């Protein structure tokens, strides 16, 4: 089944609820970057959060949202991009990190990411300069960190859940998440009731493994109150890199540097950090890039 994000309004449109099945998306990220369990969980959670933030905060097809997380844990930096059309991409600085399970028998994402560091979200909506909101990490588990970001940087009371189940062979069994946002008009009693529902909710990975859909997860969060479902959005890992794009960057290099690639290496090769795609440039390709300056 293809990945998607479901969304809905609840409580007289006082709340927005999003839920995502991102299993195939995170599987593709794991395959492309050959991530091990702790790195997979950290990158997967960040990709899911990025998809949810993009679905809730971007309006136009060309808008872009970028998440950068740098903690003091062994996975290093996490960088992800998301769009309003349901595509995400990203990478983790150190893909080969395995750690002992934490005290509750789960992948120790907090230790992998680190509890000291920063989470930054940049929105580029094509008007003016991109806007960046930044907060310190509060737990390293990431769901709590994104909840804190929404409260402090965007002034949105929210609850975020992120979950990736990694098999013993490092493959991804399921991945997904949810985001509850309070809208203008929401009162404290309503928020407290929904937060109570969230606190008793099993991990999203457990719900997905049991066969629940994103719509059913949303209903579990809403409780007995009716919900108004909005259009579902397909979700997938996709990168907009290309040989032409990297060629444009290489064309800005000094002639001497390009000539050195020709004379010493007989060409050049570059790898996209976000997706792992490799692009080869022959001598003829490099000569064509040099000719742009003439």
Curated annotation (Swiss-Prot):
Keywords: Chaperone, Cytoplasm, Disulfide bond, Redox-active center, Stress response, Zinc. Disulfide bonds join 239-241, 272-275. InterPro entries: Heat_shock_Hsp33 (IPR000397), Heat_shock_Hsp33_C (IPR016154), Heat_shock_Hsp33_N (IPR016153). GO terms for biological process: protein refolding. Belongs to the HSP33 family. Redox regulated molecular chaperone. Protects both thermally unfolding and oxidatively damaged proteins from irreversible aggregation. Plays an important role in the bacterial defense system toward oxidative stress. This is 33 kDa chaperonin. It comes from Lacticaseibacillus casei (strain BL23) (Lactobacillus casei).
